[in-house]
Amino acid sequence: ETKDSNLLTLGPGWTRKDGYVIGVAVAAGESSWYFPIAHKSGNMSKNIVFKWLQKLCNDEKITKVFHNALYDLGWLRAEGIEVKGKIVDTMIAAPLLDENRKWYNLNSLARDYLGEYKDEKLLKSAAEEFGVDPKSGMWQLPPRYVGKYAEQDALITLKLWDNLRKKITQEECSSIFELENSLLPVLFEMKTKGVRVDVDKAHKTKKDLTKIEKSLIEEIVKETGVTVEPWVATSVAKVFDAVGLSYSRTEKSGSPMFTKQFLANQTHPIAKKIIKIREINKANTTFVDTILEHSHNGRIHCDFHSLRSDGGGTVTGRFSSSNPNLQQIPARDP
């Protein structure tokens, strides 16, 4: 378990050294344990726990089973622990068996393949008492409330792999699984290294685009007296009204409607300016801002997907990325 405050917005914090491990859950056979190391109280010795865990992870005879291995491997490395030997990820096994599932999180897979759920009652009750979110605020809870939940994570992952492994064999997908699973170390090193970006150039590009956008908006103000908000239909309607241009409305509510195609078909210069403002605004907010937001020490550590998952990926198995999507580039308006 971790304190990973910016996980949902910027991705796993281990690439940015943003957060830390609060405890480790381990399962073997039918047993499971939770070792708290960085809660606000009730912790075990971090040095002793990590010394034991390092020995366990270094044993190449032991197969290590994870659900979303890249996340755990990253945080373990951030704490100085390298995992050696065979690594299995149930998030690789699951989409091989069913690439059309809506969800691949542990609870969803456990429900469908094992007929069981993680019991979150104690965790949620404690979170409500302490006034924190049960997941993102877990680090603020005493270990006695987190331990049972964390142990379930580890034990269910082990049970799930036992179930999925049999189904993979039955479906004659073992060789494909081994191939996909063998990519794990490569994907991990790719994410760890990151993709180099020119942050200074990104800042300059943002500044230049903002200047052009502001200039176009000011031109429209001089012509119409309206400070246009390019993505707000009612605002664009005021500009059109000011120069006597007609426009479409939605059938249901009668609200103004300005699609990209409609604006492109207009010959009036002011419509062209609105199109340009939209293009510049999108380039800034969708591409440049994303680069600046996700960059750390001149690199972007995005998530790479070889298969489907809750975080992204494709049904066909085409390689993809997210947080941010590096394949998303402004092809028509470079």
Regions found by a protein language model. Give the residues of each.
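Nucleic-acid-processing active sites and adjacent nucleic-acid-binding tracks
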Residues: 29-64, 195
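Conserved nucleotide-binding/hydrolysis micro-motifs of P-loop NTPases
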Residues: 70-73, 97, 101
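Conserved beta-strand -> loop -> alpha-helix junction used to position metal-binding or nucleic-acid-contacting
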Residues: 82-99, 105-111
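Conserved "right-hand" nucleotidyltransferase catalytic core of DNA-directed polymerases
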Residues: 1-40, 84, 101, 109-114, ...
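Short glycine-rich phosphate-binding loop at a beta-alpha junction
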Residues: 61-70, 227-229
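Alpha-helical scaffold elements adjacent to nucleotide-binding pockets in ATP/GTP-utilizing enzyme cores
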Residues: 52, 72-75, 105-109
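A structural signal for short, well-ordered beta-strand segments and their strand-loop junctions
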Residues: 64-67, 87, 178
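Phosphate- and divalent-cation-binding pockets in alpha/beta enzyme and binding domains
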Residues: 71-78, 238-239
